[in-house]
């Protein structure tokens, strides 16, 4: 498992599916077994105590992302208020019975992909594109077939990132695949999340970013 200190308040975990198996878990456990999900979470927090000076006390914002070869988990000290429904406000001081009940609810909401099946008409799918340099962003803005994308350009730690959303009322799976293929001609898929960019990045061009870049450059 990899542990990265993003900043004073945020830690990122990356655990590969192979590492999961070596720890006695499998993907089915993580997605559908709440007790196993909770056990994995506390294992990660216990390991964190030895790797980083990061106290999990107080409200936490926890975001889980499933990648091709593993799981990425962001743990941020924060007070959640109006941030949406992808996180859960949970105070952790020790793994006592009350905290475990809260973690159980947290993991059910964040690890269980079944909830994604209930997306409404206004929900969107998200993709983060990392550019090698700003010239690639300019080139992408002139590409065709991306007119209905919702895009916002950020600067974060010296790099440029495009937050791309696919409105579900305009993009089916085939259209999304085609759009992503075009996007990947100009950049790389990033492991960052829209939440991380919104919290810690700097907005260079707000929605619609590609249209504004094309207009100015």
From Swiss-Prot:
Gene3D superfamilies: 3.30.70.1950. It comes from the Bacteria. Signal peptide: none annotated. InterPro entries: MecA_C_sf (IPR038471), Neg-reg_MecA (IPR008681). One of its GO terms (molecular function) is protein-macromolecule adaptor activity. Pfam families: MecA (PF05389). Coiled coil: none annotated. Enables the recognition and targeting of unfolded and aggregated proteins to the ClpC protease or to other proteins involved in proteolysis. NCBIfam families: PRK02315.1-5. Belongs to the MecA family. The N-terminal domain probably binds unfolded/aggregated proteins; the C-terminal domain interacts with ClpC. Homodimer. This is Adapter protein MecA. The gene is mecA.
């Amino acid at each position: 498992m990899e542990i990265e200190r993003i900043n004073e308040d945020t830690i990122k975990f990356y655990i590969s599916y192979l590492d999961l198996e070596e720890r006695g878990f499998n993907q089915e456990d993580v997605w559908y077994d709440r007790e196993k999900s909770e056990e994995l979470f506390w294992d990660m927090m216990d390991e964190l105590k030895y790797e980083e000076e990061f106290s999990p006390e107080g409200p936490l914002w926890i975001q889980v992302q499933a990648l091709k070869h593993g799981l990425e988990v962001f743990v941020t000290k924060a007070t959640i208020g109006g941030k949406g429904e992808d996180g859960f406000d949970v105070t952790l001081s020790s793994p006592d019975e009350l905290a475990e009940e809260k973690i159980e609810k947290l993991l059910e909401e964040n690890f269980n992909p079944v909830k994604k099946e209930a997306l409404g008409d206004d929900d969107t799918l998200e993709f983060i594109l990392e550019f090698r340099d700003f010239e690639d962003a300019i080139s992408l803005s002139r590409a065709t077939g991306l007119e209905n994308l919702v895009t916002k350009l950020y600067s974060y730690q010296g790099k440029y990132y495009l937050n791309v959303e696919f409105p579900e009322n305009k993009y089916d799976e085939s259209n999304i695949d085609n759009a992503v293929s075009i996007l990947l001609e100009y950049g790389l898929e990033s492991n960052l999340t829209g939440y991380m960019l919104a919290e810690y990045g700097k907005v260079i061009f707000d929605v619609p970013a590609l249209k504004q870049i094309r207009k100015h450059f």
